């Protein structure tokens, strides 16, 4: 929780951040970012949402050196048959009625794709290019590749000069993960007996 993060920062004597950016407070910036990608010819609309058109890039992927033809379309999400390319990714999604989080947008009630949040907020707070972007190794092949693609479509630049990725923490003879139910936070560790 945010309270745990703030408390951990204080207990570890880490300098407090100048800004704490919440994605839900930046919906207008995300909508504007998506519209700019459409205007620049890097995105298009289907009946299910707005997709980034990877065919517009001179190189994709950039960071992972993977062969895109080895990817399995639809491995994580259902394939939208209206997509121009199976590897085009959603940047804005038209919300089904039962979707909890949704906002008014030029495309109806909808919500941001996973990658657009980071691109819009980093552009707002850090500018078109910044020094270091960090994340887990699991973000390289999809999330960070797509952030780069969006930034290239919006500004013509790769957003970060340096990309640094951390490996997974190991716990109980395996990867630690929130979804695996074995994640330990600093708050949990210093409150345990």
Model-derived features: positions:
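Active-site loops and adjacent core secondary-structure elements that bind or stabilize anionic groups
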Residues: 3-4
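Alpha-helical recognition segments enriched in aromatics with Gly/Pro capping
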Residues: 7, 28-193
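Divalent metal-dependent hydrolysis catalytic cores, especially in the metallo-beta-lactamase
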Residues: 10-23
């Amino acid at each position: 929780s945010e309270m745990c993060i703030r408390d951990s920062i204080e207990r570890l004597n880490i300098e407090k951040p100048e800004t704490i950016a919440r994605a839900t407070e930046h919906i207008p910036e995300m909508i504007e970012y998506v519209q700019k990608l459409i205007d620049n010819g890097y995105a298009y609309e289907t009946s299910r949402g707005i997709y980034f058109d990877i065919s517009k890039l001179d190189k994709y992927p950039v960071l992972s050196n993977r062969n895109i033809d080895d990817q399995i379309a639809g491995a994580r999400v259902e394939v939208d048959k209206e997509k121009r390319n199976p590897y085009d990714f959603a940047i804005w999604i038209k919300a089904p009625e039962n979707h909890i989080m949704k906002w008014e947008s030029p495309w109806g009630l909808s919500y941001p794709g996973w990658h657009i949040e980071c691109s819009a907020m980093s552009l707002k707070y850090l500018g078109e290019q910044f020094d270091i972007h960090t994340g887990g190794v699991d973000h390289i092949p999809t999330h960070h590749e797509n952030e780069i693609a969006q930034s290239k479509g919006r500004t013509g630049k790769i957003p970060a000069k340096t990309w640094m990725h951390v490996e997974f923490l190991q716990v109980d003879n395996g990867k630690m993960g929130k979804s695996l139910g074995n994640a330990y936070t600093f708050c949990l560790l210093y409150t345990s007996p």
